[in-house]
Amino acid sequence: MLNVLMLGVGQCGNRILDAVNRQAFGGSRLAKYYSKQRFPSRVETIAINTAINDLKELKFTAAKDRLHVPNLHGVGANRSKGKQGFWENQEMILEEIEKRGDFDLIFVMTSVSGGTGSSFSPLMIHELKKRYKNATIVPIAVLPFREEGTIYLQNAAFCLREMIEVEADGMILVDNQYLKRFSGDIASAYDRINTMVAQRLLFLIEALDSEMLSVTDLGDFKTVMNGGLRMGTLGYYQADKKSPSIRAAIKNSLREVGLLYPANVDAGEAGRAMIVIQGSREYLNVDEITKEIESLTETIGHVFKGIVIKKGEPRVLSVLSLERAPGLVELYEKAKWAIQEERERKDRARSELYEAFEQINDLEEIY
């Protein structure tokens, strides 16, 4: 049995964790008080935040699984303030995590653009790696809508770089900007994106801890996530009775519409993959699955496959590591502009203010 820890850090991470618990508890707001989570593994969940109101809004996460970092009321998207808050409270945070026991797999779910999540997460991963030396630690990094503002863009750029520098075991990217086009307005986009992430993570956890006809395990997952850029994404597709073709289901799980971050597999943007196929035995033709997996190796360097017999139409989860990420290059170009824009605005405002002050340089107060 796998021991899994899921940390939701900051508002975005908290909401993804709440979506995980909603699906794990079965969707009832009251279920968290009397039901057991529907995990095959031992899974611990903790929502961490500096803003207590963000924790209060969670509907499916039990009170014991909410950790408020005291003496802070959010950090106002200021990563410097957030880092200071983490260092001042790190022992309290890590002690709460260590109470939950040992873990084989740790997910750190966060927005890379806000305040608490983007400042806490790289530092937390660094500390967790020292304390859980044998655990696989993977951040779920949510990229911002590009129109959210200059501060969020610069936060995203620095947080992503720091997550790579602390040497997490790969990183799963989720791109709000990309996924928004499937969800309409921003409010409904947030809910849909959180649900999509939760669905894929729960499928992954279940697959890693299931008896399989063809086996993939945590070691395979780690190998995939450490490939290429050490950044990856998750894809998903569920077939129906009208079109239960297993080969089509595998293909569709790799199409951009099913991915959390856009990757053109046919153009060689994926370096490694783990494909997990689940469904009733009648749909799972091993020869057809093998042929499709072999065809994928023409564009993907190495593909692990797992087959899980479970009643229902085929469902496919794809885990991809990225060889190229043009969208990230574009994000960093925008972040560079955002940083320069912020600096110029500050300099301009200060210059205007000092010019105003100069008008009274030769004057004294008169009463």
Curated annotation (Swiss-Prot):
InterPro entries: CetZ, FtsZ/CetZ, Tubulin/FtsZ_GTPase_sf, Tubulin_FtsZ_GTPase. Keywords: Cell shape, Cytoplasm, GTP-binding, Nucleotide-binding. One of its GO terms (biological process) is cell division. Its main location: cytoplasm. SMART domains: Tubulin (SM00864). Gene3D superfamilies: Tubulin/FtsZ, GTPase domain. This is Tubulin-like protein CetZ. It comes from Methanothrix thermoacetophila (strain DSM 6194 / JCM 14653 / NBRC 101360 / PT). The lineage of its organism: Archaea, Methanobacteriati, Methanobacteriota, Stenosarchaea group, Methanomicrobia.
